[in-house]
Regions:
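Catalytic cores of extracellular degradative/oxidative enzymes
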Residues: 1-201, 205-228, 232-294
């Protein structure tokens, strides 16, 4: 937001959030090597149960902080998180494609690609290529990027598939390959064809108890990615009536301010790039005029 507008308060938000991530969210000491340098999962009490997994470690924000401030701790923290991700990926949890949900290795890939783009250090690439290969095996064995939920249940979780698609797309932009492009299109086609309710909106998860409206903006980014890859506007028209709801939720106007009911800073960070990416695609195609705002 600061880069687009020059409004200082957005930079202040970045600095405060990045310093919190660097000082509080990252493990600075532990006898467990799988924790050192990694980012705690956001849980009650900040690190209840001491959980650390690839799906809850992010580096792009602290890299942005490094670029805006010159504070080398930003880059150092990003590298330490990346090193932690590399160690976690060598654990049994990630050994077999399909035994962890798509967002686990999806978020890991996104972090590692960002670190490669920033540093050009090829140490990040080996696991990137391993993750890409695991997604290919996953699709071949299960038909799609299904997520394990019980010992005998595999389901679609659209937003988790979208995490994977967004991360694979970031790799594709650096290392374009036709097989990766086609794998992405198939994954997003699966979301469009199988992850919607009768009302035309995406569902949360493919379980009867969780098959409710899902407005995670990562789903919109996946549609924009499919449009970028194919030029077909049908992807942008899918679920277009959910766009306004996903963007603003409930809101009220007070004087010249629009107040949106609260979400976490993580929620904002996760939503901003998907919304802007989708909005740009709608603007480029003229479909923005079809969006209903709530």
């Amino acid at each position: 937001m600061y880069a687009r507008t020059g409004i200082r308060r957005f930079l202040d938000y970045l600095i405060v959030s990045a310093k919190h991530q660097m000082d509080v969210d990252v493990c600075h000491y532990s006898k467990n090597p799988l924790r050192i340098g990694g980012q705690w999962e956001h849980t009650a009490g900040h690190c209840k149960n001491g959980i650390m997994v690839c799906s809850h470690e992010w580096v792009e924000g602290v890299i942005d902080y490094y670029h805006f401030t010159g504070d080398e701790r930003g880059l150092e923290t990003a590298i330490s998180i990346g090193d932690n991700i590399l160690r976690l990926l060598d654990t049994p949890m990630y050994a077999k494609p399909g035994e962890a949900n798509a967002r686990e290795t999806g978020w890991a890939l996104r972090a590692l690609v960002a670190l490669y783009v920033e540093t050009r250090d090829e140490k990040w690439l080996a696991k990137c290529e391993w993750i890409i290969d695991s997604f290919k095996i996953w699709e071949e064995e299960y038909g799609n990027w299904l997520a394990p939920y019980t010992d005998n249940t595999l389901i679609r979780v659209g937003f988790m598939i979208s995490v994977a698609a967004g991360s694979v797309m970031r790799y594709y932009r650096v290392f374009p390959r036709e097989d990766i492009k086609q794998m992405l299109i198939r994954a997003i086609d699966d979301i469009v064809e199988n992850c919607t309710l009768d009302n035309g909106l995406f569902y949360y998860k493919e379980l009867p108890s969780l098959s409710r409206n899902g407005n995670n903006t990562l789903l919109l980014e996946s549609l924009a990615i499919a449009y970028e890859l194919t030029g077909d506007k049908k992807y942008l028209e899918t679920n277009i009536n959910n766009t306004g709801r996903a963007g603003v939720g409930s809101k009220k106007v007070i004087d010249d301010a629009v107040i949106v009911s609260g979400d976490s800073t993580k929620g904002f960070a996760q939503s901003f790039i998907p919304l802007v990416t989708y909005y740009k695609a709608l603007g480029d195609t003229g479909l923005i005029n079809n969006v209903k705002l709530y």
